[in-house]
């Protein structure tokens, strides 16, 4: 009898580590704060993100209801017949943090410029000299797989955010020394990594928590991690694809059992496994640091926004509600297609080509106007509509009311302006 009673008591014991306890405590405190709709600080992106974000997770049933569900009314459940059940500790609270994909069908489409703007907002303080900046006062992990990270450009973008805010508020512009001090302090919280392959990228992500939790290696110990940025996630795709094809060629004629054993032990290269491991590591870090993930991709078989899909492309032709919406599958293997919360497509605003019948004088007359349009550096962003035939009707209606999810932005020498 005593042994049976002790066994029942043990079933009610919930064991967890200190890290899980602190994680749940922080998440619980955050849930009591007013809900902010500014995940990234860019109004059109945040508005679109709200449409695609699933309901907030982390709520759990009261102990009695939970016991009823878990026991399914079974009288043989551990606490049946022993009075009110003891409170069952809630499961680990899981808050939802967005994953943003920014893709294009060509280079120089504005992807990295948006990333710089997002990173600048993440590291800047929430206010400057008492004036709200819209910054998050956090740290950013920037994984530069393309080898093109430009710290000076990031500094310029961050400076423009401060100066444009001061100008809008009518504040004094003679604060250059304070602005530079703020920029210097903020840029210390951008942690740049430059892996040279997908396997190196996985290793970087696997050791990232060790680095971030070692307060002797950086000055961001008192700041939360706002986002992990990968620019770009497709940087190593073609070399990975070649390596995968070589590995599959070497497997010809070998016993299937040996091939599978090596795959399970990760002794051989598999493209699908590598990219699945990348997503798994990013999700692990998201759960650990409660941060967003932002990554860029370049689609290898997409089309420009203004062009219509054909029957032989990678476009979804089943839905005609948004005929001008760009729509192409993820260029990366599964599960990357389902990983992002919001998929954006960006491109430079196209300039209408000359008419085939235009004369030389007409071309010369229009040339200055066309050059002026090019110099404006105007870009357009939109929701990637791949799979929209499965989207809820309410979501489609909301997108229709929001110009089909299209927004404009201008990239200038000093920064980015969103329409």
Question: Which residue ranges define each predicted feature?
Answer:
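N-terminal regions of ATP-driven nucleic-acid and macromolecular assemblies
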Residues: 1-419
């Amino acid at each position: 009898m005593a042994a049976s009673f002790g066994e029942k008591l043990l079933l009610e014991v919930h064991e967890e580590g200190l890290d899980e306890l602190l994680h749940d405590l922080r998440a619980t405190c955050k849930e009591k704060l007013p809900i902010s709709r500014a995940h990234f600080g860019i109004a059109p992106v945040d508005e679109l993100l709200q449409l695609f974000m699933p309901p907030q997770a982390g709520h759990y049933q009261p102990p009695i209801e939970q016991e009823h569900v878990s026991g399914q009314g079974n009288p043989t459940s551990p606490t049946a017949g022993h009075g009110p059940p003891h409170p069952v500790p809630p499961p680990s609270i899981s808050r939802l943090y967005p994953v943003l994909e920014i893709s294009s069908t060509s280079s120089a489409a504005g992807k990295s410029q948006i990333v710089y703007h997002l990173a600048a907002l993440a590291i800047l303080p929430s206010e400057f000299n008492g004036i709200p900046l819209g910054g998050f006062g956090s740290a950013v992990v920037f994984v530069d797989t393309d080898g093109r990270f430009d710290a000076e450009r990031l500094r310029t973008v961050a400076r423009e955010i401060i100066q444009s805010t001061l100008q809008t508020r009518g504040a004094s512009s003679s604060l250059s020394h304070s602005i530079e001090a703020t920029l210097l302090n903020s840029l210390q919280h951008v942690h740049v990594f430059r892996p040279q392959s997908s396997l190196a990228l996985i290793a970087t992500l696997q050791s990232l928590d060790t680095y971030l939790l070692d307060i002797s290696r950086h000055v961001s110990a008192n700041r939360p991690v706002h986002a992990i940025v990968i620019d770009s996630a497709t940087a190593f795709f073609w070399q990975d694809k070649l390596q995968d094809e070589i590995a599959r060629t070497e497997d010809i004629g070998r016993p299937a059992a040996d091939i599978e054993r090596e795959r399970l032990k990760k002794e051989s290269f598999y493209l699908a496994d590598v990219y699945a491991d990348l997503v798994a590591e990013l999700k692990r870090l998201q759960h650990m640091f409660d941060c967003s993930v932002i990554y860029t991709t370049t689609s290898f078989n997409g089309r420009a926004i203004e062009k219509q899909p054909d029957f032989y492309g990678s476009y979804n032709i089943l839905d005609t509600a948004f005929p001008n919406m760009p729509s192409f599958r993820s260029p990366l293997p599964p599960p990357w297609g389902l990983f992002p919360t919001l998929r954006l497509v960006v491109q430079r605003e196209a300039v209408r080509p000359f008419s085939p019948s235009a004369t030389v004088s007409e071309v010369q007359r229009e040339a200055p106007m066309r050059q002026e349009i090019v110099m404006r550096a105007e870009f357009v962003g939109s929701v990637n509509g791949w799979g929209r035939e499965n989207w809820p009707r309410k979501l489609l209606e909301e997108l229709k009311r929001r110009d089909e999810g299209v927004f404009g932005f201008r990239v200038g020498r000093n920064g980015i302006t969103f329409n």
